[in-house]
Structures are given as structure tokens and as C-alpha cells.
């Protein structure tokens, strides 16, 4: 045999590694049911046990971070359902499974299916409140979908008869347990909607195990309840039993009897309400009649009081009383008017204007004399002050100085000449005398030794 045709040779380590990879990649995660044996829990908190059936067994490990989510304590001999990964422990070549989750077998498997369907329908929105239909109030006809031989129907009919015997009830008999039950329940719901005889439906059964109630966890039943045009009250099992039908139904009743309570009226309570209403109406009528009678008596009395003869007599009496009051008032008014006239006459005499006018004229004459004297004195003093001022002005006036033989010479720009250096030859000068003005032209300028004002000859 050529070397190229020789079989592959594995080491033990490589063999175990290859087998482990094949198991993990090919098998992946699986569900396994079996009986627990050799269960141990060391200080690490991990679980080690064996799963077996009648002919085989396999070693299992469930690590602490996974087993703390298990809600029960595994027992020797207990049947369980586990979700696990298949692997191989390479150092010893031991084939084993690593458990991720564990639950009791039987009902545990059903519970798993229940949770999966619940999550699916919830994700689709079948449990949303916006899709819940209101129950009729009051209901005029009730449909019951349940077994005709079950205790649930007996309880429902008993409650309805006690509370509202006149309420019509239509029974849609169906199986509530077994493989055929979901299909029969769906057909009963569809039939009730097709006939449209009822305005509310009760769908339910009595209590039982999870397996007994499983028909109401069927997806077909849930979708039929959701699609029903007639409002549905679910009444499955006892108060602690919760099914998928309860989540989808428009209302969940804890028991069938409670469902009957919900959809019916309490006739005895209605009778009590009618009697109470009747009593209130009778009391209201009695009050109304008494009030009307009292009103009639008042009106009758008023009519008697307003008889024409009585009114005429009252008017006559009132007229006489008013006449007396008017006469007395006129006398008092005339008396007060006379007294007022006398008082005004006395005041007029006391306040005669002639004397007041005479006193005013005398006062005016006195004031005129005093005013004239004051004006004359002020005028004389003013004239004297004016004369003194004129005399003083004449004494200091430049014109008086000119009249005494002096003169004032100014240049062409009007500046008064005080020194010869202000004058230039050929310049025109103006000289003011006491009786006039002389205009001359400078032909020569001579400065004297003494600082005297130089005069120029024209």
C-alpha cells in the first residue's frame, strides 16, 4: 500500500476534540426527557446528575448560573424535560450534556407550549385592550358553549335561573376535552356568529389539570374567539386556572358561575329597585297633590279676598283716610308757608341795601382821596429825582466838555486819537467840536518831547 493511500491516524486528543466539535456543531441544542438519578450538588453550586430511561443513560451537568433559574428542587427518580447542548469531556473522553433549562416532564412540556403560544399571540396583538368588545347591558340572549353534560353548564343555568329567569339561553353543545374538542369549540363559535341569535357568549368548562384544560390553550380556539363578532366571556376552570382563551376573550370570569353573574341581571335586585322607584313615585305624587291642594286653597282664599264688594269697601276706607291726610297736609303746608313769609320779611328789613350802598359810597370817596394824595406825593418825588439826574448827566456829559473849548479827534476807523503814533500822513481825521465836526487830512506828524496829545492842522 502506498503512503498516500494509508488511513488517517488520529491522536487521542485530536480524536476527542474532533468528536466534541462534531457533537456540538451537528447536534446543537436539543430537548431531552428522562429520569433523574445520582443527583449531586458540590460546594461550587453546580448540579451533576444522570438522565436515564429504561435502556440507556447519559451524564449531565447544569452550572450554577443556569440552575438558579429552576423553580423546583430536582429529586431522584423525577421525570424532567431539559434543554441542553451535547458535548464531550476531552480529558476522559466522556460523552455528556450541558443542561441550560429544566422543567418537570408531562405538564412541564405543556407549560412550555403554553408559554410559546402566549408569547406568539401577544406579539400579534391579540391580547390588546383596543380589540376588547363591550358586553351588552342588559343582555337579551345568552349563548353558552360548553359540554351539555358538564358541571359548568349546570352552574351557569342555575345562576341564570336564580338571577334572571326570563333571560333566554341558547346552548351550543361541544366537547371540552380531548383531541376533537378544539375543532368543535371553533365550529360552535362560528355557528353562534352565523346564526346571530345571542348578544353575548360564555365559552368555558369546569376545573381540571393543565392537560384537561388544554383545549382552551389551542391556537385555533384563541383565533376563533378573537374573530368573533359577538362578545365572549371566558369561564375556564377555577380562579387559579388561566388559559390562552382568557387572554383573548373580551372578558375573563374566574368561574362559570361568575360568568353567569356577569352577563345576567339580578331580577330580585331589579324588583327591589322597581319597588323603591314605585315608593319614590308614590311619595312624589303625594307631595305633588298636597302641594296642589295647598295652592288651590291659597288661590281660593285670594279670590274671596278680592271680591268686588270687599275691594270697594277697602277702596272707600282708603279714600277717606287719604282725604284726611291731604287736608291735614294742606293745613300744615299753609301754616309753614305763612311762617316762612314772616321770617323772610324780617330778614329783608334787616338786610335793606340803601344803608349798605351809603356806607360803600363813603368808603369809595375816602379811598379816592387817599389815592390822589399818594399819587401827587409820588409824582413830586419822581420829578425831583429826575431833575437831579439831569443835572448830574449834564455835568459828566462829553458835550459839556466840548462846549468849554475842547475837541475829540478820531481816525477813519472811528478810534479816538490819544497819541501821534496813531496818525499817518495823508490820513483823514474827524474832529468833533462843541458846535460841529471838522474833517481834515494829515500833512505832517510831529512828536513833542512831552507826552502830550498832538493836534493836527488841516
Curated annotation (Swiss-Prot):
GO terms for biological process: DNA catabolic process. InterPro entries: Exonuc_VII_L, Exonuc_VII_lsu_C, OB-fold_nuc-bd_dom. It is found in: Cytoplasm. This is Exodeoxyribonuclease 7 large subunit. Signal peptide: none annotated. GO terms for molecular function: exodeoxyribonuclease VII activity; nucleic acid binding. Heterooligomer composed of large and small subunits. Bidirectionally degrades single-stranded DNA into large acid-insoluble oligonucleotides, which are then degraded further into small acid-soluble oligonucleotides. CDD domains: ExoVII_LU_OBF. One of its GO terms (cellular component) is exodeoxyribonuclease VII complex. Its EC number is 3.1.11.6. Keywords: Cytoplasm, Exonuclease, Hydrolase, Nuclease.
